[in-house]
């Protein structure tokens, strides 16, 4: 499979909230985030009632805006709807399986938590980007391992693929993550937990395009 959109080198990376059963609301929230400047959308379907329908709806939205849609940890769903790629855990074999099944042009991102060595291994095994975190307290994954901001600096020196920072990222603390070496900031609650996802996305987007 070949993605219709390439993975960006910087910008806001939004991840949908789990457990939503309203496809129209999910679509509207993602549309708002894209209007606000989001550059990547990841769909998380672990507790979704209708993952296929939701993913198809979001793919249509993302295609319209020329933004890649990635599926969280579900290669089958990615293939079924023709999404641009997947985001997976750090397991070496899972990355190899994903690349074999999705092909050389699919976008594949890997969670590396606080390990630059893991990120280097993922890069060597053809990951298109790596993600580190959580950096700050997170309501989505409160028990996720803590990552050190210094990890971003070391990763920036060692890696050539884009670096994503995740975990409790706000428009305020995101500055230090970008200064430390992150290229993209991944956000869930900060955008989709806000009253106005479009306005929230715009606030984050100012970190790359200050006025």
Model regions and ranges:
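Conserved N-terminal beta1-alpha1 strand-loop-helix module at the mouth
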Residues: 1-92, 100-128, 144-147, 154, ...
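A short, polar/charged loop-to-alpha-helix boundary motif
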Residues: 93-96, 138-139
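Phosphate-binding beta-alpha-beta segment of Rossmann-like dinucleotide-binding domains, i.e.
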Residues: 132, 140-145
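Conserved sequence/active-site signature of Rossmann-fold short-chain dehydrogenase/reductase
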Residues: 135
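C-terminal binding/interaction regions
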Residues: 180, 184-187
């Amino acid at each position: 499979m070949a993605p219709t959109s390439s993975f960006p080198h910087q910008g806001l990376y939004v991840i949908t909230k789990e457990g939503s059963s309203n496809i129209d609301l999910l679509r509207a929230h993602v549309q708002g985030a894209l209007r606000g400047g989001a550059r990547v959308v990841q769909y998380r379907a672990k507790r979704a009632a209708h993952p296929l329908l939701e993913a198809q709806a979001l793919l249509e939205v993302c295609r319209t805006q020329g933004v890649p849609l990635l599926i969280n940890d579900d290669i089958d769903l990615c293939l079924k709807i023709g999404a641009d790629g997947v985001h997976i855990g750090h397991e070496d074999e899972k990355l190899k399986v994903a690349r074999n099944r999705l092909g050389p042009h699919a976008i594949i991102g890997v969670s590396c938590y606080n390990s630059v060595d893991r990120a280097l291994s993922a890069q060597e095994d053809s990951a298109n980007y790596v993600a580190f975190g959580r950096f700050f307290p997170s309501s989505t994954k409160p028990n996720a391992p803590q990552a050190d901001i210094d990890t971003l600096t070391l990763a920036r020196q060692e890696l050539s693929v884009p670096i994503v920072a995740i975990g409790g990222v706000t428009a305020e603390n995101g500055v230090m993550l970008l200064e430390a070496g992150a290229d993209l900031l991944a956000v869930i609650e900060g955008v989709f937990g806000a009253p106005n996802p479009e306005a929230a996305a715009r606030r984050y987007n100012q970190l790359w395009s200050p006025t």
